[in-house]
Every structure is written in C-alpha cells, then in structure tokens.
Amino acid sequence: MKGVGIPEILSYGRTKHYNILVEPFLGKSLFHLYQENNKHFDMKDICLMGIQIIDRLEWIHSKNVIHRDIKPDNFLIGQSNPNIIYLIDFGLSTKYRSSVSGRHIKFGFTGKLTGTTKYSSANSIRGAEQSRKDDLESVAYMIIFFMKGYLPWQDVDSKDEINKLFKIYMMKKNIPEKNLCSGLPQEICAFLKYIKNLHFEEQPDYNYLRSLFKW
C-alpha cells in the first residue's frame, strides 16, 4: 500500500527464522506525545489529528482493507515532517471486501477479540466480524480518551477474562453517547452516534465525519 501517511515499504524478505519488513524510521506515537504533554492535547490539535486519522482510514478502506487495531500507539508522526500522521502496524488487518468481485464479507462471529480491548468496538469485544464502522468506532474512543483522559471501561477488573470482556462489551453497547461524551463538544457525540448507527456493510460518509472536526 502507498498513500499519504502510510509508511512506504523499502524492502522485505525472510531469513531462516524471521520475516523482514523495512520501513522508514518515523517519530513518536500519539500516545507517547500525549504522555509527554502531561496527558493533554489542545482541542485544535485533536481536531487536526481527527481529520488526518479519518483520511488514513478512508484510504485503506478504499483498498478493501480494515485495520482492526486502531489506537494511539499505532499513529506516529513523521520524522522529517511532524505534521503528517502515519498509520502503522497492519498485523491484524484483513480484507473486508473482495478486490475481484467487490463482495463484502458477511456479518458473523469469529469467537475471539481482534484488537486492543480499550479501543475496540463493541462488536469486536464480543468476537464478531469487523467492518469499516469498527475502525471508526475505535477512532471515536481514541478521541474521547484524548479529550477526557480516560474511558469508563478501562478500570473494569475481573479474575476471569471472559467475564471482564463481557462487562466491557455491555458498557460499550449500552452507555448512551451523551453520557460517554458528557462535557465534550456536541460534534464528538454526533461522530460516535453516526458510527454506531451505520449498518455492517454500509460505506461511511468520510466527508461528513471530517466536517465534525472543522470548527
């Protein structure tokens, strides 16, 4: 893949024990920058990030690929140009639509979580197939985390991992958008609500989503 904010593959190959992929050296992750900045980003910076993040997802989605592990650690700034945000780590990525037939995958259950619990969509938590809307739901949680400094399910604890995931799933599924986004600009609530109302195979309106960060 090659696009703005998608690392170029410089070389690849394999040895007896390893697969090798060489990419350009990039800068710090958004999570690292957030930590360095006393766990705070200006609203203007968050809006600029949001627009670029949507750009990256629209591009990979146009190539019939979903990322499935959207989180602050997987967005890095450029080394030579820190104004460009790069999306990295496609280890969990998969095709959601055939490049030949154009047929979208069907909704179903894989039986396992794919992604990072804190930012994964509710459907992913319950082991369902993911589509474009799930990548974008993760973006919403990431933006809310940057604005609030926490997500309500990150402190859920249980000795039983299945029970823990069930509790997190129920929170993500049932918490009203207005509660999760309380104290935040109404555009963030609109962003999350729009994504949650998308059908599994529906193409997101990326222009509309970008417009929610232009204020």
Residue positions per predicted region:
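Short beta-strand micro-motifs within the conserved protein kinase catalytic domain, predominantly
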Residues: 8-19
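Conserved C-lobe activation region of Hanks-type protein kinase-like domains
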Residues: 124-181
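Protein kinase subdomain VIII
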Residues: 101-102, 113-128
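Structural motif in protein kinase domains
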Residues: 26-36
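Activation segment signature within eukaryotic-like protein kinase domains
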Residues: 49-50
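Structural motif at the C-terminus of the N-lobe alphaC helix and the adjacent alphaC-beta4 loop
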Residues: 1-4
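Activation segment/activation loop of eukaryotic-type protein kinase catalytic domains
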Residues: 78-114
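Catalytic-loop of the protein kinase fold
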Residues: 61-79
